[in-house]
Structure formats: structure tokens, C-alpha cells
Amino acid sequence: WTEANRPKLDWQTKIFYSGSACMYPEYNQTDPDNPDCREESAYPAAPDSEYGWEKLFSERLYLAYNRNHGIPVRIARYHNIFGPEGTWDGGREKAPAAICRKVAAVPPSGGSIEVWGDGLQTRSFLYIDECIEATRRLMESDFKGPVNIGSEEMVSINELVDTAAKVSH
């Protein structure tokens, strides 16, 4: 995006930014009994990684562009989207794919898998079709400001492992 493009835009132009729940403060993401990831809970800012900081800073840049130039901006904060064609391995996969891959590798006679942390961490998971529908609705709306796109249901990593194990063998 450059200022040179600005004169070419018409009144229907909107800018979309794909954010992430990783921009929420680490303390909001680690308490399984109180996973506070409401849009307004982003501050005071304290993401747990450079990726989270990049997502937060980028949101601020797009919102500043909106304020300064009047072009509508829509920001989606995605939460663990999964579905077909998602990355399955290699370290970039989401938790559902990583857990399913690990569970599928356990022989029917039994075994264990590595779970980072204590497994009590909770996450919001959303199927890709629901994600696409939510994104479409966001783009068609007049809503201003970042919007979470994820499920309201929080699932612990241990629950995800148990579910994957039940359906795999």
C-alpha cells in the first residue's frame, strides 16, 4: 500500500487487516480460569512474542491511517482457525493439527504425546468456513475497531488431546 494508490480509490474501498489473538497480553492468555481476550483487554499491551507485538503495532498503524485519511479499515483478530488444507506439520501448524498429528502417530497399543505446558491452557478454535463467514460479515459491516473472530467456547489443550484420542483409534 502506498499513498500513490490513494487517488485511484473510490468511496467503496475498505482496507482489511488480518490480526491475531496473539496480540493480547500474555497474562490474558495463560490463566485457564480467566481467559480474558475481549477486544478492550488488549491494553496495557504485553504480548508474549515479537509476532504478537507486530500484530498489535500493525493494527495501530492501520487505525492511524483510517483516522488520517478516512479510508475504512476492518481488523479481524483471528483465534486458532482450523480446517482442510491447513498446515499439518513443520512447526507452523495450529494446535488442532499438531495434536491430531501427534495422536495419530501413537500406536493402537498405547503411548503418550508431548504437550507443551501443563495442558490446562485454553484456546478458542474456529472452523475455516465459520471464519470466512465472519470475515465477510465484518467487511460488509460499518463496525470500526478490531473484532475477535473465534469461538466463545474455550477448550483446554488436554481436552483437545482427549477428543483427538477418542476419534483416532
Predicted regions and their residues:
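Conserved Rossmann-fold NAD(P)-dependent oxidoreductase catalytic core, especially the SDR/UDP-sugar
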Residues: 1-49, 74
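Active-site Tyr-X1-5-Lys
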Residues: 3-5, 26, 46-79, 98-109
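Active-site loop of short-chain dehydrogenase/reductase
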Residues: 6-15, 70-72, 110-112, 118, ...
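Proline-centered turn/helix-capping motifs that create local helix->coil transitions or kinks
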Residues: 16, 22-32, 70, 104-111, ...
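Conserved short acidic donor-positioning loop in nucleotide-sugar-dependent glycosyltransferases
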Residues: 21, 99, 152
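Short glycine-/acidic-enriched loop or helix-start segments at secondary-structure transitions
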Residues: 26-28, 85, 158-160
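Glycine-rich "substrate-gating" loop/helix at the edge of Rossmann-like oxidoreductase active sites
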Residues: 47-51, 79-93, 117-129, 151-155
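C-terminal substrate-binding subdomain of Rossmann-fold SDR/epimerase-dehydratase oxidoreductases
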Residues: 105-169
